[in-house]
Amino acid sequence: MAKATQDSNRPHKADVGSAIPNHDLPPIPGRYHADREELLEFYRRMLMIRRFEERCGQLYGLGLIAGFCHLYIGQEAVAVGLQAALQPGRDSVITGYREHGHMLAYGIDPKIVMAELTGRASGISHGKGGSMHMFSTEHKFFGGNGIVGAQVPLGAGLAFAHKYRNDGGCSAAYFGDGSANQGQVYEAYNMAALWKLPVIFVIENNGYAMGTSIQRANAHTALSERGAGFGIPALVVDGMDVLEVRGAATVAVDWVQAGKGPIILEMKTYRYRGHSMSDPARYRSREEVNDMKENHDPLDNLKKDLFAAGVPEAELVKLDEDIRQQVKEAADFAEKAPLPADEELYTNILVGKY
């Protein structure tokens, strides 16, 4: 059984990746100092993703969500911590097919996300995107991309647009450890470095590319170091700690907005469920998964900070109840919403008449 040695790879503090001769390096970020309200907001968004994805799993089992469905459970701290440093309406986000969490982390209404998952006209992509292809120019969320690694050059392109327009924005391009082996990723690295584009390349390293562990697929597993040949600095971050992620995100945003070019953030994280809903994940042991849940869970990690800040357990219980109700309302809304009209087949296409 192939096993991803997450414990040995995950740093306790964010650290700078491989040294790059004759180049500036970003400072080593500290753990973000959040006040009580910020801690609660981080927890609320992470818990929303967790409960939303759990409900997605149920709806998929009932046949209300069709096609592929990739859940974000376990990785919540990455999207929430990183996107808390971005400015909605200015900065762009693009990711792969495991996208629900990124949309919710950006504050997008769970009702229209759930409606999209169930193929309804009121979904954020009018029922045509489904789980893998959600899209919203209004929110500067550019997918949801089903082709492995294809979002990375698009993320560099979004950064080019920000630089060309001189609007002060940057782009965050998320991809996984499996995507990191795609050739187009290195083409994007090269152009982003050459043109000093304001792009944050976010590697969500959850240890497995579908069912293949990182050790079986990579001759060199330090993914953060792969940008060194292009002069791109990197930070390796504990992606199970939202405050570590938030601290690294601040450094990354400051770096790209200072005109220093791209930066890589390798987030050491873990997904609790299989690659998709059809994956029983027999390639890893139950003990491995349970260890991550019991000893490294991002919500439990943040709870310690909340308790230290004086937040009582009862307040978190009430917050969980409220979020469960919001998720229920989102699911009810999605189930009752109408399906798209037949005419919707002919919208948003390149050629409408032959």
UniProtKB/Swiss-Prot annotation:
Keywords: Oxidoreductase, Pyruvate, Thiamine pyrophosphate. One of its GO terms (molecular function) is pyruvate dehydrogenase (acetyl-transferring) activity. Its cofactor is thiamine diphosphate. Pfam families: E1_dh. The keyword Cytoplasm does not apply. InterPro entries: DH_E1 (IPR001017), PDH_E1_Alpha_Subunit (IPR050642), Pyrv_DH_E1_asu_subgrp-y (IPR017597), THDP-binding (IPR029061). GO terms for cellular component: intracellular membrane-bounded organelle. It is an enzyme of class 1 (oxidoreductase). Gene3D superfamilies: 3.40.50.970. GO terms for biological process: pyruvate decarboxylation to acetyl-CoA. Residues 1-29 are annotated as: Disordered. Heterodimer of an alpha and a beta chain. NCBIfam families: PDH_E1_alph_y. The pyruvate dehydrogenase complex catalyzes the overall conversion of pyruvate to acetyl-CoA and CO(2). It contains multiple copies of three enzymatic components: pyruvate dehydrogenase (E1), dihydrolipoamide acetyltransferase (E2) and lipoamide dehydrogenase (E3). This is Pyruvate dehydrogenase E1 component subunit alpha. The gene is pdhA.
